[in-house]
């Protein structure tokens, strides 16, 4: 009759080996599932931003030249964090109700908002069609009153490429979300090693304008 005793060394080694095998299979699957979830959430967020921009423009609150057509907005305007830019007679306060979640009220110094493993950033056009970022400190006086009525762009890229996401996404006034898988974009320009997409990363043409056609599948 076997006496009551603990595990033998061989039994412990077998258990450890089994756990190691399970971990080797499970951990990559868990990471892949998290990446997929973050990327799916990023696309959904861009669609929400696109919808918010359409609603904001329809109010004509940001009618900088008072021609009856509204312009597109920044995160702070859309979320009700800061007063709508000067221009429209009724644009003397916060957008109420806001058209975008309060989670977008606190962009960093670059104008980037972090959500679910991704950074998001809105660019609005200047007089040459180049992107400027009011959420990052660019004055609204640099935004072109005419072009902003038809043009805007928002990028989403991984906070940590390979760990929080692999793909970079973009949406603009067309409402179509496009993507590329590239390790060019990761983190924030406020961190060492961080590289955010330039305003024209997904746009065709050599003039660096955000008014051109989308270049699907490019790496910027």
Regions of interest found by a model, annotated:
Residues 2-30:
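N-terminal single-pass transmembrane signal-anchor helix
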Residues 24, 39, 55:
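Functionally critical, cavity-lining and gating residues within the transmembrane helices
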Residues 29-46:
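Aliphatic-rich helix starts adjacent to a transmembrane/signal segment
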Residues 51-174, 181, 203-219:
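Extracellular/periplasmic head regions of type IV pilus-like filament subunits
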Residues 172-197:
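A short, surface-exposed interaction/processing loop segment used at functional sites
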Residues 194-199, 203, 220:
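Phosphate-recognition beta-domain surfaces
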